[in-house]
Regions:
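Conserved helicase RecA-like core
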Residues: 1-168
Length: 168
């Protein structure tokens, strides 16, 4: 998660200061391309161990697609939130600026909202995640990179505000 939350430059600095002869272990629930590149750079004689079956999100998720003009996206989002029963909603934005903008507008519409992306401080990220898990926030707006690997119970709806670059 540290890498997902924007600590890659810090990890690189630490690794540069480590001795050449060392044992390095990397554990991850998912291995996106940037983590694979880091692993190839950091690990020597690496052994890859995969546990469990790979499952496609499509096996357990019902999908809906709403073609809408860009100018109407937020109005549709509000309509979906008002007309749908949910425990908690995770909204993905492609950009940090977009996530902030969506969150600000949702707050103006009386929704309890947390924001998660790499421009937030570590303290803000922890508070947002803990608040979302506890139910303090009904909506979490996040970039896809920031939210990778997060495990939150009772998320009833996931909304891709922007079309995702990768279907997972």
């Amino acid at each position: 998660r540290m890498l997902d939350m924007g600590f890659l430059p810090d990890v690189r600095k630490i690794v540069d200061r480590c001795p050449k002869q060392r044992q390095t272990m990397l554990f991850s629930a998912t291995i996106p391309p940037e983590i694979e590149r880091l692993a190839a750079w950091v690990l020597r004689n690496a052994e890859k161990i995969e546990i469990g079956e790979r499952r496609s999100p499509a096996e357990t998720v019902t999908h809906a697609f709403y073609p809408v003009a860009t100018s109407q996206k937020f109005h549709l989002l509000i309509a979906l939130l008002e007309r749908t029963e949910f425990n908690s909603v995770l909204i993905f934005s492609r950009t940090k600026h977009g996530a902030d903008k969506i969150a600000t507008r949702l707050k103006a519409n009386n929704h309890a909202v947390a924001v998660l992306h790499s421009n937030r401080t570590q303290r803000e990220r922890i508070e947002a995640l803990e608040g979302f898990k506890s139910g303090k926030y009904e909506v979490m707006v996040a970039t896809d990179i920031a939210a990778r690997g997060i495990d939150v119970e009772d998320v009833t709806h996931v909304i891709n505000y922007d079309v995702p670059q990768h279907p997972e």
